Amino acid sequence: MKVREMDIELYRNYSNMLENRSKPGWQYNEIKSCGVKFNSAMRARAYDKCHQRFRDFKKESEEIIAILGLNTDQTVIDIGCGTGAFTIHAAKHLKKVYAVDVSKAMLRLARRKARKAKLDNIEFCHGGFLTYEHRAEPVDAIVSSHVLHHLPDFWKLIGLKRLVQMLKTNGRLYLHDVVFSFDIASYESRINGFIQSMTEKLGLQSPEGLNIHFRQEHSTCNWIMQGFLERAGFVIDKADYKDDFMASYLCTRKGE
């Protein structure tokens, strides 16, 4: 990293520290992300390039919009929007998108994409499951993809309960993340196999980024995730488990 970029990163870290002074001393600091550090400008720039090797962002976005049954009169929160993969596509089809992320570096890239696409119906917000304050009217839907695993389990539940309050009654949540549904007795062989497969699929020189996910981040088991969603105030309409490592949930906020 160049000297100028290092200076900028130090300033951003200091700024984030000041922001979190207003929070209780016991609250989990979601701004200081665990695992791979996406607060880094360098990491943010590399994110799209890496994920495009195994994800079709446009197809994913279209499928999510269809699953949620969204239309041009509706609003959505993209919690953990990253560089705007879903946000930018969704904004072309919806009334408004609230794009939320803990990484200012990611948000900067997302804003650039929005300007390039000439989209003016996106509100970018710095925050996450625990810190984002939604001051507008409740939204029709919330989308969260590859994000919730950054929170420890207790804070996952707190974050999901906060999302419920941002949704209209009968509003919907689409949640996609790393969730373990394999037989725990075979965890070593399953994890080793997954890491080897993804290393080859992504053309990585080293599996360390994947190792970090299992070693430092907070992916959980399917039965735990289902319990969190239900206790938070959601009805699970559909749960889809893929390859024993990925899960998608379509949920509805319970009526009053």
Locate the predicted segments by residue.
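Conserved class I S-adenosyl-L-methionine
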Residues: 3-71, 73-80
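Class I SAM-dependent methyltransferase SAM/SAH-binding core
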Residues: 83-131
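A conserved beta-strand element that flanks and buttresses the S-adenosyl-L-methionine
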Residues: 143
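Short catalytic micro-motifs in class I SAM-dependent methyltransferases
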Residues: 146-147
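A short glycine-rich, Lys/Arg-flanked "PGG" loop and its adjoining helix->strand segment in the class I
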Residues: 157-169
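C-terminal alpha-helical "lid/dimerization" subdomain adjacent to the S-adenosyl-L-methionine
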Residues: 176-232, 239
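Core SAM-dependent methyltransferase catalytic element
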Residues: 232-234, 238-256
